[in-house]
Amino acid sequence: MNFLRGVMGGQSAGPQHTEAETIQKLCDRVASSTLLDDRRNAVRALKSLSKKYRLEVGIQAMEHLIHVLQTDRSDSEIIGYALDTLYNIISNEEEEEVEENSTRQSEDLGSQFTEIFIKQQENVTLLLSLLEEFDFHVRWPGVKLLTSLLKQLGPQVQQIILVSPMGVSRLMDLLADSREVIRNDGVLLLQALTRSNGAIQKIVAFENAFERLLDIISEEGNSDGGIVVEDCLILLQNLLKNNNSNQNFFKEGSYIQRMKPWFEVGDENSGWSAQKVTNLHLMLQLVRVLVSPTNPPGATSSCQKAMFQCGLLQQLCTILMATGVPADILTETINTVSEVIRGCQVNQDYFASVNAPSNPPRPAIVVLLMSMVNERQPFVLRCAVLYCFQCFLYKNQKGQGEIVSTLLPSTIDATGNSVSAGQLLCGGLFSTDSLSNWCAAVALAHALQENATQKEQLLRVQLATSIGNPPVSLLQQCTNILSQGSKIQTRVGLLMLLCTWLSNCPIAVTHFLHNSANVPFLTGQIAENLGEEEQLVQGLCALLLGISIYFNDNSLESYMKEKLKQLIEKRIGKENFIEKLGFISKHELYSRASQKPQPNFPSPEYMIFDHEFTKLVKELEGVITKAIYKSSEEDKKEEEVKKTLEQHDNIVTHYKNMIREQDLQLEELRQQVSTLKCQNEQLQTAVTQQVSQIQQHKDQYNLLKIQLGKDNQHQGSYSEGAQMNGIQPEEIGRLREEIEELKRNQELLQSQLTEKDSMIENMKSSQTSGTNEQSSAIVSARDSEQVAELKQELATLKSQLNSQSVEITKLQTEKQELLQKTEAFAKSVEVQGETETIIATKTTDVEGRLSALLQETKELKNEIKALSEERTAIKEQLDSSNSTIAILQTEKDKLELEITDSKKEQDDLLVLLADQDQKILSLKNKLKDLGHPVEEEDELESGDQEDEDDESEDPGKDLDHI
């Protein structure tokens, strides 16, 4: 308490004593009064005094106020007064207009009161429970008090909330509050809660924070919204920055797609308010958080692809090429586009296709490079363009080739109507502005990064320096400017370009050494004792000379490795050379540039090193040091071993290619076998359908035959019923003649039916052709068996190829062992003969195994040829099956035609039978008219046989009776 009293300093005793007594009396009322109204009025009075007499109220009343929160929860009014009073005691916001010393004292006072409050963790838990109250007068001051506690002692309060049951979940409900004041202050509370605490960030994210925050941003109008949008964006950054789990959750939840409307800035005349600029700036930063180069590569790549697929990258490029965009927004947009396309081939290709809305249209890359080499543009904008160009070329060999091609003579526009990227880079490289020199040199170096092909292509570039003089190569022009003693920034940029160009490119080293003035210039620069400003240039010259030694293929007799090392030892000294080489990594700006890919410098004079170049220095510094101290014999042995290993690599690569080709051939054969199998199945299906159709025709024929038999029986019954008793002789004679005629017709019909039966029998015999179908099915089965055999043989070939791959792996392992033994040999000269014997033995062994592999490959080719012949035979068999099926189809058509004819003839027979039935019916009617009884149809059927017998015994009996 004494410390807290001392914070406010010495003040007049009179008033302080009076206010202290008043505060004491109010505290006594709060503690001892039994009436709720008295306690409420006392707390309200303490609230009014707490802003002016913060120390006194805090010292005397804090304990009583906490007790009120515990005991009087049923009365929201007194709880609200108590929370407001505690907020006034702990918060420092009211002290902003006080002098600086007083402000510092008040901040200490707020921290002390916060420490007293959270000393009992139950107080924070109590405050969290009060936030569940929906009453505005309780929830709002509770939110403000907890926010103030987090601002004062954030980590301690975060830990208490983290271990409290449902602590974070209670706070998440604030985002769903319908009262904007509470919702907005809830966002501020979550900002303070999630700052620098990954565990709380994960809990908040999985409590559906992303969905709620994005909804608030959308409701408030996206970038056109107010400060609430700004607060939500800051909270989103807290949740996502350096938190891989939340970033992955954000991407998988498809929240990246919801960011696209943020960048629909609309009409350029709509204006850019300060709040809109701030909001858009934070939105761009949030995109960069998701694709930051410091994130895991897999997470960054997936976010980049999602941004392209949902159209976010396209929207950013629209802002990039728009007019009227504020400078800081344009700069941040360039940086954002840079990281969205960095290392992503699809995004880089799209960016290369973007054109500026000019007449004629120009590529966006060209427009940006024009800004980079223009010294009148802001420094931060030029840095952003350089970063964008670097990201466009990062791991993009296609883009590197396109940039270098604009420098080659065959692609330069002779009319001069358009400016290419290469022309702009050359213009910047040889400009009078040192910053343009440095930017152009670094940009061109990135076009050569890890791309030996483009390094060789760039050697073809010729520059016309002046009228009447022959053209000069770009490499020579760079060394000429370097030797003219220009500004340090220019020389550093050119030296970085030359080091990048010559590394891993012996042809470029040869071109560089071919100019006799280059080596003396470098040795002279290194040997001189210059000031601290020139030490960096000396270190870069030493690095360039070391690269010329390490990547030298000894094609120039006057500048072979050994001669260059002797020159260094004679003119510079090896120790001095290594010391100068170490100046690079010891420079204060080297470590700053090595941290991040983005060229972020406070001012132009700090723009010295490039991030990718620092990686090159780290890679080459050690090997150059070793190369300087190596003897000529060690170099020769190392070269021989390298050549041997290269030969082995070439042989292994050759056989890998052969095996790859064989794999392709086998895959083609598999596809062909699969195709033949499908065709065979189709043919079998067709044959089955034909057999079923023929069976249907047979069934139809049998049915027709049965129907014809029934019709004949019915006709016989009618004819026999015509023999009646009691008919006149002339009538009987006439009837007999008619019956005879009907019999003749019946015999004629019977003969026709017999012919039809014979025809149908022929049809039955023709159905024996179905055996051909069975034979075709047998052929198909044989085809299936042959296909299975082919599959088995292909599997055997595949296993043989796998064994060859294992052999090649063994060869690679032995090659690695050879390399290790060679390095061991380089360290120990005494075992020279033994090492050479081992290498020769291993080489012979490798060649023997490779010969065996070649023989096996030849056998595989023969087997593949045999498979091709078998496939041809299968195809011929399938063709014969097709012809058989065609014959079956023809015979089936003939059968169908004959069956149709037989149906027509049967219809004619039925018509004749109907006529006969009509005649018989008329005869029966005549007999009835004559008075002779006529038997019914059933009686006739039952007595057919008896009537036939009577007629045969006494044909004249009926006449006698009459």
Curated annotation (Swiss-Prot):
GO terms for cellular component: cytosol; endoplasmic reticulum; ER to Golgi transport vesicle membrane; fibrillar center; Golgi apparatus; Golgi membrane; Golgi stack; membrane. GO terms for biological process: endoplasmic reticulum to Golgi vesicle-mediated transport; Golgi vesicle docking; intracellular protein transport; membrane fusion; regulation of cellular response to insulin stimulus; secretory granule localization; small GTPase-mediated signal transduction; transcytosis. GO terms for molecular function: cadherin binding; RNA binding. The modification Phosphoserine is found at S50, S942, S952. Residues 1-637 are annotated as: Globular head. Its main location: cytoplasm. Residues 763-783, 926-962 are annotated as: Disordered. Residues 935-953 have a biased composition (Acidic residues). SMART domains: ARM. Phosphorylated in a cell cycle-specific manner; phosphorylated in interphase but not in mitotic cells. Dephosphorylated protein associates with the Golgi membrane; phosphorylation promotes dissociation. Residues 638-930 form a coiled coil. Residues 763-778 have a biased composition (Polar residues). Changing S942D: Decreased association with Golgi membranes. It comes from the Eukaryota. ARM repeats lie at residues 20-60, 61-121, 123-163, 166-207, 208-253, 255-310, 311-354, 363-408, 420-459, 473-513, 518-571, 573-630. It is found in: Cytoplasm, Cytosol; Golgi apparatus membrane. InterPro entries: ARM-like (IPR011989), ARM-type_fold (IPR016024), Armadillo (IPR000225), P115_Arm_rpt (IPR041209), Uso1_p115_C (IPR006955), Vesicle_P115 (IPR024095), Vesicle_Uso1_P115_head (IPR006953). PROSITE patterns: ARM_REPEAT (PS50176). The modification N6-acetyllysine is found at K202. General vesicular transport factor required for intercisternal transport in the Golgi stack; it is required for transcytotic fusion and/or subsequent binding of the vesicles to the target membrane. May well act as a vesicular anchor by interacting with the target membrane and holding the vesicular and target membranes in proximity. Belongs to the VDP/USO1/EDE1 family. Homodimer. Dimerizes by parallel association of the tails, resulting in an elongated structure with two globular head domains side by side, and a long rod-like tail structure. Interacts with MIF. Composed of a globular head, an elongated tail (coiled-coil) and a highly acidic C-terminal domain. This is General vesicular transport factor p115. It comes from Homo sapiens (Human).
